């Protein structure tokens, strides 16, 4: 879907009309749905998980996609190391948890974020690893957990293409893409490859 005149940073969602059935999933035009291909998401400050499953209009309490730039990040100045598998040593880490602790090499304002991982790259490099594997880094609902617990690990993502807002410095929904790109570029500059953990069944 392309809408002429929509600018960078504009928020949007979908309403889908069709038959409504009490027997199970169907169309529900009172619901604003997130674009499954969204590259950025806004509305975390007003999002209410319960409104997504109620019969009421959720437009005031839903997540919305954000129009992002269409250009691709130029990694030509930050080439991937391309090590052979037999030479690869992977360090799996949680994008938020790794740098959140006060003993982390991350600066205080970057703790728990993609930028905090950049601060920690000299330490990671000193371990002799050749790659990092990020546990799920895409947008997920922290409330998607039983008994009032938190979804800390990031599985069951809401959007496969938008970075998780909790790993981003600042409130700008467009900053997530840039900060994740900065992390990947910095890893390459430190001789480290980057793998992203994705699990499609949960």
Regions found by a protein language model. Give the residues of each.
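Short amphipathic alpha-helices and their capping/turn segments at secondary-structure boundaries
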Residues: 77-82, 119-128, 184-188
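Hydrophobic faces of well-ordered beta-strands that scaffold small-molecule active sites
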Residues: 89-91, 132-134, 194-196
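Ligand-binding face of N-terminal immunoglobulin V-set domains in extracellular IgSF glycoproteins
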Residues: 1-3
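Carboxylate/His-rich catalytic cores and anion/metal-binding grooves
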Residues: 124-145, 149
